[in-house]
Curated annotation (Swiss-Prot):
InterPro entries: UPF0761_bac, Virul_fac_BrkB. Belongs to the UPF0761 family. This is UPF0761 membrane protein Plut_1323. The chain crosses the membrane at residues 51-71, 105-125, 147-167, 188-208, 221-241, 251-271.
Length: 427
């Protein structure tokens, strides 16, 4: 295999290893935050409030559409789109109830309509508070800033939804009318609900947290949440069609627990996506976990390099830096160069007349301690890899344990003695 192919394969293995390490560290961190934020309890609270607010919220949305004459004909299409695409399995029954409830709200007096608007604002405020708790934002929005955000969501949200439906309808019925374009139209229409879900969740994760959120993190959370949402829709539709536990128990009232259960699932998905977005940003800010303290960090790699040079000298082979880098291709090249520089400066190795490297002739009298005390103070901060094939035979676990015992014995001093300076001679 060509050297270039080896480099490509090594790069792929390294990236796969890095991805695996990321997921191994990310998943426990994510689960820990899910438990800490109690998203299932928050989802239940939001589901209950949504069940009480959904009719006022839809009434406000449709009322705003009625204000604009151009969008008034789209009202039934918006109703159908919301119910059939976001409440699976019970769309016909729920739409019939919603139409009656919403029709009743249109006959309410002005104070009743104002109450509906306040109820819708309270729901959005609760969502805002819940998401900001996930992001650990303890400073609430200013009243004017929060009201502006909620007002924008209630007014521009329906307009944007209706505009997208109107634009798509114009394109569907003027461009995609026959032949292959008609088939393409059908496929694109099937993707429209998922696309709107991704965009809605993306805006939710970007705008609602009172903290800067990276676009890529918000998009990742929105995509994962949309995938979970589609899986939940299919499972819920299957459950309603084949199991029908709620209908068997509650009869004609089954629509209420079914709707509540579906809203609960939806909020679990939304909050799960929010946790993913938060954890991606938190992991990036905190960086990788700090390695455990190891006074011999990097020493095994240094001994492996020194052994390689020593063995090559015994076989009459001259080594240079390129050969060392090729042998230790899994390691950080800058760390390897620093190791070689230290060994040369401390005379554990020397350069030959031909420019190669050779081990010192008195290695049999030099000790590990002689090597250790020559290490620079920042040597342990270098980026050293994990033990690989080139490290075989370099085993320092016994030395590490004895060194740890010496540290423990030497530092077995109560901290209070260091605070007040008493018994200083015992330190």
């Amino acid at each position: 295999m060509a050297p270039g192919s080896n480099g490509i394969m090594d790069g792929m293995h390294r990236r796969i290893g890095e991805a695996g390490a990321f997921f191994r560290s990310f998943v426990p961190f994510f689960l820990q935050n899910v438990r800490h934020d109690r998203i299932f309890l928050s989802a239940g609270s939001l589901a209950f409030q949504t069940l009480l607010s959904i009719v006022p919220l839809l009434a406000v949305v449709l009322s705003i559409l009625n204000v604009f004459a151009v969008f008034a004909p789209l009202q039934p299409y918006v109703e159908d789109f919301i119910v059939h695409n976001f409440v699976p399995g019970t769309g016909g029954m729920i739409r019939e109830y919603f139409s009656g409830f919403i029709g009743n709200t249109f006959t309410m007096p002005i104070f009743g309509a104002l109450f509906l608007f306040i109820v819708a604002l309270v729901l959005i405020s609760t969502v805002d508070h819940t998401l900001n708790e996930i992001w650990e934002v303890h400073s609430p929005r200013k009243v004017l800033q929060g009201f502006t955000l909620y007002w924008t969501v209630l007014t521009l949200g329906p307009v944007l939804l209706a505009t997208s439906l109107a634009a798509s309808s114009f394109v569907w019925y003027t461009v995609f009318t026959e032949g292959p374009l008609l088939e393409l139209k059908t496929r694109l229409l099937s993707l429209l609900p998922s696309t709107i879900t991704v965009l809605a969740l993306l805006l939710l994760y970007l705008l609602v947290p009172n903290r800067r959120v990276r676009f890529l993190h918000a998009l990742s959370g929105a995509l994962v949440a949309t995938l979970l949402f589609e899986v939940s829709k299919r499972w819920f539709a299957f459950y309603v069609a084949n199991v029908a536990t709620f209908e068997h128990i509650y009869g004609a009232l089954s629509v209420i627990p079914m709707l509540f259960f579906w809203i609960y699932l939806g909020w679990v998905v939304v909050l799960t996506g929010a946790e993913i977005v938060y954890c991606l940003g938190a992991r990036r800010l905190s960086g990788p976990a700090a390695p455990e303290f190891d006074p011999l960090r990097g020493v095994p790699l240094m001994l492996a390099v020194l052994r390689m040079v020593w063995r090559a000298g015994g076989e009459g082979v001259v080594l240079d830096m390129k050969k060392i880098l090729r042998e230790f291709h899994r390691e950080n090249p800058s760390s390897l160069r620093k190791i070689v520089d230290i060994l040369l400066e401390c005379r554990f190795m020397h350069l030959t007349a031909s420019g190669g490297m050779a081990a010192a002739s008195d290695l049999h009298v030099m000790t590990l301690y002689d090597l250790f005390i020559k290490l620079p103070p920042d040597f342990g901060a270098e980026d050293f890899g994990q033990a690989g094939p080139a490290w075989d035979g370099i085993e320092l676990q016994g030395v590490r344990e004895r060194l740890g015992a010496c540290f423990e014995e030497s530092m077995h001093v109560p901290l209070i003695q260091l605070m007040d300076g008493s018994n200083e001679g015992q330190v």
